[in-house]
Amino acid sequence: MEEAILVPCVLGLLLLPILAMLMALCVHCHRLPGSYDSTSSDSLYPRGIQFKRPHTVAPWPPAYPPVTSYPPLSQPDLLPIPRSPQPLGGSHRTPSSRRDSDGANSVASYENEGASGIRGAQAGWGVWGPSWTRLTPVSLPPEPACEDADEDEDDYHNPGYLVVLPDSTPATSTAAPSAPALSTPGIRDSAFSMESIDDYVNVPESGESAEASLDGSREYVNVSQELHPGAAKTEPAALSSQEAEEVEEEGAPDYENLQELN
């Protein structure tokens, strides 16, 4: 009988701490419901992943400050502006400046004929509706030519440039045509010698000076034909044109040595 009583007592003593722990856990869970939710979420997802709330973006301030409406200011009384007197019948005509601009833009302008047409048009609009009016094209006066470009050309004078006039009439020269200039000095010398060969001849000097020369050659002096007529007799006939060309090509001297006949 004693063993049957001791066994349930021992089991009851072992279950008491377990029941106490369960009661404590239940009371703690009822007091902290938020902690329970967090523990449940942690148990579902691994601890390495952290969930954060979405970042709320603050609204941008407006680029322009808000416009505050103010009540309109009281406008002062406007005085009527005096107008210049206009000629009769000129109210329905377009001004000259507008006509000029219309003419420049190639737009035809029209005007109504007579004041009766205007009255009829006004009456038509007020009573029966729009009425047709007769329009006639107005011929504008031609615009004056622009002379600014011509005036600028006349006023512009540049000293750095020369004004070249067209050769309308060729210049007539009264002077005789000059002889063609010779290009080389040798030809000029030969031509001069051909011209002067008739004026001068070479005659030997005195016998003493001829004997005194070392090489035995005689010296000659240019003497005019008029001063020495005897030498002119011994001068050979004038060379022909063909012989003169040969002399020029060979580079012969410009004078001839004539010896006095013994």
UniProtKB/Swiss-Prot annotation:
Extracellular side: 1-4
Region (Disordered): 69-115, 206-262
Keywords: Adaptive immunity, Cell membrane, Immunity, Lipoprotein, Mast cell degranulation, Membrane, Palmitate, Phosphoprotein, Signal-anchor, Transmembrane, Transmembrane helix, Ubl conjugation
Biased composition (Acidic residues): 243-253
Listed transmembrane segments: 5-27
Lipid attachment locations (S-palmitoyl cysteine): C26, C29
One of the GO biological process terms: T cell receptor signaling pathway
Post-translational modification: Phosphorylated on tyrosines by ZAP70 upon TCR activation, or by SYK upon other immunoreceptor activation; which leads to the recruitment of multiple signaling molecules. Is one of the most prominently tyrosine-phosphorylated proteins detected following TCR engagement. May be dephosphorylated by PTPRJ. Phosphorylated by ITK leading to the recruitment of VAV1 to LAT-containing complexes.
Start and end residues of each stretch annotated as Interaction with GRB2, GRAP2 and PIK3R1: 200-203, 220-223
Location relative to the cell: Cell membrane
Tissue specificity field: Expressed in thymus, T-cells, NK cells, mast cells and, at lower levels, in spleen. Present in T-cells but not B-cells (at protein level).
Superkingdom assignment: Eukaryota
Annotated region described as Interaction with PLCG1, given as residue ranges: 161-164
One Pfam family here: LAT
Sites bearing Phosphoserine, chain numbering: S40, S41, S43, S84, S101, S106, S109, S224, S240, S241
Record has Ribosomal protein as a keyword: no
GO cellular component terms listed in the entry, alphabetical order: cell-cell junction; COP9 signalosome; Golgi apparatus; immunological synapse; membrane; membrane raft; plasma membrane; TCR signalosome
Modified residues (Phosphotyrosine): Y110, Y156, Y161, Y200, Y220, Y255
GO molecular function term, any single one: protein kinase binding
Topological domain spans for side Cytoplasmic: 28-262
Subunit text: When phosphorylated, interacts directly with the PIK3R1 subunit of phosphoinositide 3-kinase and the SH2 domains of GRB2, GRAP, GRAP2, PLCG1 and PLCG2. Interacts indirectly with CBL, SOS, VAV, and LCP2. Interacts with SHB, SKAP2 and CLNK. Interacts with FCGR1A. Interacts with GRB2, PLCG1 and THEMIS upon TCR activation in thymocytes. Interacts with THEMIS2. (Microbial infection) Interacts with herpes virus 1/HHV-1 protein US3; this interaction prevents the interaction between LAT and TRAF6.
PANTHER family hit by this protein: LINKER FOR ACTIVATION OF T-CELLS FAMILY MEMBER 1
Disease per record: Immunodeficiency 52: An autosomal recessive primary immunodeficiency characterized by T-cell abnormalities, resulting in severe combined immunodeficiency, autoimmune disease, progressive lymphopenia and hypogammaglobulinemia, and lymphoproliferation with splenomegaly. Patients develop severe recurrent infections from infancy.
Name the UniProt record assigns to this protein: Linker for activation of T-cells family member 1
